């Protein structure tokens, strides 16, 4: 859970039909009392009128037309306060989908996008994320946090329930709230149905949604260049597949059938779900962070097969520090790096680094307390912030830590330490070149080492920055005038940087010597990229 000012929201307890569950609380500013409901109490109905949505805000999945609370009377309304850089917010999406399926048109879910980062305030960027994650309910751009403040939200995600009479029932923060919300929503629908006050008819915005772009690549998240073997691996994330091409763009193979799923097999039958980071263990073995499958996949480039080595598709908060890899349930792995016989994993969902040993087939906690933060120190004491990019110079592991807009340096082996090269806090971000603590990045998702320098995908600034790890000096290398749109990853080969230019649905190629940026044209004579 993302916490504003570091203050966690303490949930009260409530009794519902004799079952003790984590409870809702009243929104700050509406009422100071916790919501406590016992089995013998007749009603869950709220008492405080829900604050109206301000006029003239941008709406998504409504054709641009605003939604009013008045027209939602007769429905249970669930407000989901989120920000699109927050991984915990995306963990809530499957719960929202389950709730919508349970209650159909009796429940209306409204996404209230209240941005943390400056770039997240842009409606066009929110639209891209709505597409990437398949969000089909209405979303309002609460860019100045007016709705957030009116409802007293304090952390991302926060979920607020409004009853069919238009009154606030309560709210709860953090992921993992499905059981509570399901009980409360179900009870409200039962209560108001008995009073003849439920409107089960679909509303006017039902079925309105954005159209997905028809492009060869769809929101590619990461890229891996292999200069020695003239290969380029592309995580074609929203097509749920890996594309293998030459460095000049000739498509050699497509790995995965393009449908979301967790299935092993040959290239044509294997399935991925929103794959991200990749790394080569050797010329014949590619590892993939299969992010939405909460799995690590191994691709045999000779046999042309895909095998799951860790994860079973379920996401949990990992409390054990070591376990057999195949039986492990992971938490949103976003990047991988193979070094000296060990696979390092950026476990973004719980702000830690893990490791996989192919010889023992075990997975172990490597670094991070699990607390979201930017604390340096020993491997066990250090904290990370949604780590999403990994690289190495052979001596150190370098980590792109986006929620702290930071770059971290991590030693290898027992007794190693974690040091911050760039970044000062979870809410310290911007676009400032300079040295050390004066530098400001904005939600950097990618990093690669090349020719003595660290190149950073400064994602929300839509730039590529270069960092000298010894002096901590950062300078802008490319971008800033529309060349990129939220690049998620990058990799180098020879004189070129290859950039996953995510929102432009392309791979960009940057000449390191001249700085010239061009689109990598994919040559696909066998039509391997065609979607089924």
Protein language model regions, located:
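Thiol-based oxidoreductase modules, predominantly thioredoxin-like and allied folds used
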Residues: 106-121, 135-145
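Thiol-/selenol-based redox modules, centered on thioredoxin-like
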Residues: 163-222
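Short, internal strand/loop/helix patches
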Residues: 127-162
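Residue-level detector of Asp-centered blade-edge/turn motifs that repeat once per structural unit
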Residues: 225-229, 280-283, 338-341, 392-395, ...
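Gly/Pro-rich loop segments of beta-rich domains
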Residues: 199-221, 249-276, 305-334, 362-386, ...
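N-terminal "domain-start" segment that seeds a small globular fold
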Residues: 31-69
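Conserved beta-strand positions in repeat-built beta-propeller and related beta-rich domains
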Residues: 226, 232-238, 286-291, 345-349, ...
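Conserved redox-active cysteine motifs that mediate thiol-disulfide chemistry
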Residues: 81-98
